[in-house]
Swiss-Prot record:
Compartments in which it is found: Endosome, Multivesicular body membrane; Cytoplasmic vesicle membrane; Late endosome membrane; Lysosome membrane
Entry's family note: Belongs to the ABC transporter superfamily. ABCA family.
UniProt KW Transport keyword: yes
Residues spanning the membrane: 22-42, 261-283, 307-327, 344-364, 373-393, 405-425, 447-467, 925-945, 1100-1120, 1144-1164, 1183-1203, 1213-1233, 1245-1265, 1306-1326
Protein name: Phospholipid-transporting ATPase ABCA3
Organism, scientific name: Homo sapiens
Effect of Q215K: In SMDP3; loss of lamellar bodies membrane location; loss of proteolytic cleavage; increases cellular free cholesterol and phosphatidylcholine transport; loss of vesicles formation; increases free cholesterol induced cell death; loss of protein oligomerization
Residues marked Cleavage (site): K174, E175
Native organism taxonomy: Eukaryota, Metazoa, Chordata, Craniata, Vertebrata
Result, substituting L1580P: In SMDP3; does not affect location in intracellular vesicle membrane; does not affect proteolytic cleavage; does not affect N-glycosylation; loss of ATP hydrolysis activity; decreases ATP binding in vitro; affects the intracellular vesicles development; decreases phosphatidylcholine transport
Superkingdom to which the source organism belongs: Eukaryota
Mutagenesis / variant outcome for changing G1221S: In SMDP3; does not affect intracellular vesicle membrane location; does not affect proteolytic cleavage; does not affect N-glycosylation; loss of ATP hydrolysis activity
Pfam family, one: R1_ABCA1
GO cellular component terms, A-Z: alveolar lamellar body; alveolar lamellar body membrane; cytoplasmic vesicle membrane; extracellular space; intracellular membrane-bounded organelle; lamellar body; lamellar body membrane; late endosome
Amino acid sequence: MAVLRQLALLLWKNYTLQKRKVLVTVLELFLPLLFSGILIWLRLKIQSENVPNATIYPGQSIQELPLFFTFPPPGDTWELAYIPSHSDAAKTVTETVRRALVINMRVRGFPSEKDFEDYIRYDNCSSSVLAAVVFEHPFNHSKEPLPLAVKYHLRFSYTRRNYMWTQTGSFFLKETEGWHTTSLFPLFPNPGPREPTSPDGGEPGYIREGFLAVQHAVDRAIMEYHADAATRQLFQRLTVTIKRFPYPPFIADPFLVAIQYQLPLLLLLSFTYTALTIARAVVQEKERRLKEYMRMMGLSSWLHWSAWFLLFFLFLLIAASFMTLLFCVKVKPNVAVLSRSDPSLVLAFLLCFAISTISFSFMVSTFFSKANMAAAFGGFLYFFTYIPYFFVAPRYNWMTLSQKLCSCLLSNVAMAMGAQLIGKFEAKGMGIQWRDLLSPVNVDDDFCFGQVLGMLLLDSVLYGLVTWYMEAVFPGQFGVPQPWYFFIMPSYWCGKPRAVAGKEEEDSDPEKALRNEYFEAEPEDLVAGIKIKHLSKVFRVGNKDRAAVRDLNLNLYEGQITVLLGHNGAGKTTTLSMLTGLFPPTSGRAYISGYEISQDMVQIRKSLGLCPQHDILFDNLTVAEHLYFYAQLKGLSRQKCPEEVKQMLHIIGLEDKWNSRSRFLSGGMRRKLSIGIALIAGSKVLILDEPTSGMDAISRRAIWDLLQRQKSDRTIVLTTHFMDEADLLGDRIAIMAKGELQCCGSSLFLKQKYGAGYHMTLVKEPHCNPEDISQLVHHHVPNATLESSAGAELSFILPRESTHRFEGLFAKLEKKQKELGIASFGASITTMEEVFLRVGKLVDSSMDIQAIQLPALQYQHERRASDWAVDSNLCGAMDPSDGIGALIEEERTAVKLNTGLALHCQQFWAMFLKKAAYSWREWKMVAAQVLVPLTCVTLALLAINYSSELFDDPMLRLTLGEYGRTVVPFSVPGTSQLGQQLSEHLKDALQAEGQEPREVLGDLEEFLIFRASVEGGGFNERCLVAASFRDVGERTVVNALFNNQAYHSPATALAVVDNLLFKLLCGPHASIVVSNFPQPRSALQAAKDQFNEGRKGFDIALNLLFAMAFLASTFSILAVSERAVQAKHVQFVSGVHVASFWLSALLWDLISFLIPSLLLLVVFKAFDVRAFTRDGHMADTLLLLLLYGWAIIPLMYLMNFFFLGAATAYTRLTIFNILSGIATFLMVTIMRIPAVKLEELSKTLDHVFLVLPNHCLGMAVSSFYENYETRRYCTSSEVAAHYCKKYNIQYQENFYAWSAPGVGRFVASMAASGCAYLILLFLIETNLLQRLRGILCALRRRRTLTELYTRMPVLPEDQDVADERTRILAPSPDSLLHTPLIIKELSKVYEQRVPLLAVDRLSLAVQKGECFGLLGFNGAGKTTTFKMLTGEESLTSGDAFVGGHRISSDVGKVRQRIGYCPQFDALLDHMTGREMLVMYARLRGIPERHIGACVENTLRGLLLEPHANKLVRTYSGGNKRKLSTGIALIGEPAVIFLDEPSTGMDPVARRLLWDTVARARESGKAIIITSHSMEECEALCTRLAIMVQGQFKCLGSPQHLKSKFGSGYSLRAKVQSEGQQEALEEFKAFVDLTFPGSVLEDEHQGMVHYHLPGRDLSWAKVFGILEKAKEKYGVDDYSVSQISLEQVFLSFAHLQPPTAEEGR
């Protein structure tokens, strides 16, 4: 039951996701309909011709050779060969034949057939040999007579000599050479009579090639040999004629020709997009870790696959139903695409194919971990498995049943063979019916439709098994692999024996032995929710083992939040991954709720809530749907779900967002939702990996409150990079370093162990004497130490144990402040950050934290000194420049940046190398670019050559027995005595052979017409020959009738009659068995298989187009990726010119395209494709390919603007290329078949499609080939030239002629469209189109702004903000040039249904050497402001100036002066850190000789040197932020924008970043920074503003804002554990009484956190009161610090509406 519930839930999830992806869903349903629509459209356009009367054919004489053979062959006489030459009987018979055939001819004998074949093959004499008569008797000596039962075969020329030119559109009806002796019926049957205009039956030419004349002459000669006189006498009164069966009224329908060839390909194309989508959707869940996350939540793997299967099956069922409807619905009276087939069987076939397609895509998905690659290779493999059909189709008749079945192991080949069978049954006039399921289409074939369906289902099972195995053994980056032999392990099938829960409780606690001073005693009254014992994890990197976690022992308790800290790479995430079952541990154990992780993961997952570091959300599910889905997945009943979801929405504060899709949520909201998912359904154990990363202060607070409220009955473990978060939330804090646990305890415990105590910072006046102050401090606190004395700042460390002495010290300092020359002083407690840094330093002494006290920390001390100032008025501005700054300034001025042409060349080179690096690193894709076209074309050529290399035709017995049991009608009109005699013999002979003679009393031809009308297609297989015997005057005419639907019926009919005459003359034992065994091809003929290769050009073009569809799409991948991650924007901000950016890409891509193009020429040469390689045409072929590259690459660049992700772009562009190439090419080509009668429409469409490079390539390649072969044929001989003229076969001497079949128009259009697409690309990139639109919208915008301003509530403006505005709006031209950044009344309105004012009239000036902080809640407008200032977004009104240049009109010059670090890392994964910095240095114009030093300095400053040569994709989040900042700083831009630069960094990395930024500031840069970390703003910013609703609400230095908007202190205290509760209540009452208005912020485990208000409280007073309370209330420890900037920030929270989205 639970399984069904989970399945239903997954189906609901998949269906909902699919429903929201409207375009994908529409395409999945639309493409099959489109291709079905093409067939319907053709069906409507192709007129079928009704032939209302029966077709009667005249009789044909076989007494003499056709007229053609009366002319001698070139320079010779005809030869009649016989074998064996040593037999007199054979020679006698042959001479008799020569005399009978009355043409000038000589007889030549050969000892054996081998001699004859050598003569034909190598002496090039086949043209003069009329035929060879080979007697199949040993003839032991020359006089041995011919037996009565004669067997012989005739060997005529393989190439027909007297064939009429038939132009039925050689693309589809490939007129093969030869006698078709491999088959009895055509491979593709025709509706109506075969060759309706040929009374002699046409192909293979039994009458017109003289075969029947020779056969009859040989038969008569054999009769004469055995009964000379009787034979002459018989033939004096008897004439044998041959006549074609009449054909009943029929509808001539050329459409059925097209469908037999094209239905397989159209079905393949119909499902191609779905195949790509399936692979992409499945892999995307794997790539985003959603699949593994669902598994952690308790989902079975087979259920996951089943749900996907059912969803896609449902969609394909709908598509297949519509296709069946379109195929079988009558579009005209009695006319449909498939007029006669059973719709239910067609649907069954399509569904079997759909199932195999889904299974195939599942199988492909298991080989990839990136959705892009899965889609790319999936599409290629999907088509690749169709290519073998090109081999199978031409040699279908040669293949055995087992070979056919084996080829059906590829589902696309099985589908093609099934579609071919449907076409054949349609053409037979019967259609496919359920009764035909196990019947072949004709006697030639042993393969039936039921076998196709069976093989499609078998394929699905086999693909499923591969999927199951691959997923188990190679689960991808985030799964746990099984051993390769897992399927033979009993434990896999039966499960492991359950470990007894609770058993581990008894184990001795190994941590006790290890307890040392850095591990606080564990709480004894709490239950351990998680127990970790000796846990280790070793990863194999290359050929080395790397320990990520070493021997970890830790207990995590219920009702507590345990915080796990560690710098990037310390082993935190690995530990959590082991606990959640993502990785198996290498050794050790862990128990969660009593269950062991490696054995009982299924049980554990039921109570496990997980919030990973990355948001594991489905883009298109709403907030409520996520909660509903995961609650049900964890096992909550459906009835309880709505209430639980409602409650959770309330808990996480997303009630108003319940119906918003997750992709529209801000980062903070996404994290809240992730936490909600972890909490829902009563999870007892919560594992939260950096739950608040990327949130603003207010959202973070909300999460903290949420976790504090939820922890009571849960075990919560969380990791974070925010030390204040660890301090505030952590009941116990564990710090890891290098994979080992270093310490564990409460925040106060760790501060006692590692912390120095209080930092007291004093700001000195000029007359201050540090010695006096030092004496005073040491007098009151003897063990105080001087921390630093730098510039105007003096800093002491006061030990915690001396807090009782602080009151006296502070009182003395306040009293003697002026006398000692102290401007201000303050104190701050050891922070958690210092503890963390100290632990890191102890572990790794090489990373000396003291060495990192660069300007950032010094400046922070300066800030602190003024922050805790007793008298804020005394705080003056400080000169930021010092020695380091001066040094950097000097270095900068020494380097002169490139400009003009030198800069453009340098930028072009940088962009070119970027593309080169991409190709080098993504070598698999480059390999695919080369191999896909080569493989497709090579396989096509192999298939074509294989089909035309053609085996020599085998021997075929011309007897009725070959056709099984048949009916032979005969009639004897009148009272002919000889006729009666003959008919009796005929009956006996046929019955002896197992045939069914049937006497017809009326007119034989009328009978045949009637039976054919009644029986339809079956008649042609059951009735092949007939005979009539009638007297005409004195003679009896024996008329042998043949059914021309079978190839060999003329000779078979004649053989029946001649046998009859032989039996009449020589008795019942006489018989003649004749066979047709065509001569082998001569070397000349093999070389001359020409003209009728029209389809070869078509096949090459089709395969080339398919390959190019995949190849061309790859050119968009980097463009889309760069745009998606904003790397392109950062490159433009760094000054790259549009032309350098795109033309360098175009040049590289053309070079990349040249390689497969040249290799294609090699392939053409290897296969000797004459049209493309001979007569100087190699250059033409290369030109065609390169012009295609020139046209398609800019088109792919243009299309990149439509997509947000590389995977989506790749799949959709591949489909676009297939549609714009193959579909249009097929449409035009099919219409060009003369029989279809749509030539004019095909010309019109051909002209319309000229704008599509794919279409041009297909048509050009096909036309070029066709023109070459036609021209070669028509100029090969006078006879050929005569034929070409007679049948109006056109060709062009000039291959580049404009009209068909010249390729001039395709060449010109590809050349022109390449230019057009490039121009359009530049228009878009240079914003010219946007500017035009902007001018048009300007009037409307002014109106919108005015309306918005009047609608907005007028909020009071802060005085500092008003003063800044006044100063900026005052006219002062000098300030424009000397101020790095000036913002004047900047506004941004987003045009939507309700216009949104995102930025509202900002005015600001940022000076040199200033770091300006832009603070605000998510949605306040910070990121929008950045986007406008960097030129990514247009300005609605106002303006901004960088170095005097307007952003609105001179964005190019502005960008050369700014550096930009966006909020999300705009990095290129395929480059190393060093390569990226070098690239940006070149973009900035740093001369090449200085780049190395400049990059080294940046790497050193950011401590990125160890990672400089690693690929960016391997960087941790922190290192990526460092690199992004380095990119912004390189090249010394005047203005630097940093959007949340330190997100995701650990404290050490963050400090280093601050140092770098501080150095840049001190060198005179203007820096604008946004951050969620108030600590960062205090450390770096000289001024800051807080934004609310797009406006500045306050502006000034951090201390100014704290003094203006904040007051009071923050108090934390911990009460002793004995009698804790009682003492705690008393202490709380004391605080409330002593500090009126105090607010209790937090309370847990005897710990309290208060906010103490009041500006009049002095440090001395606070410490005095608390020291007295310490003894009285049993306070173990306490700490006091001044209110933080964060609290000032939070005081503005109520002004920001909660619904505003991030990024505005």
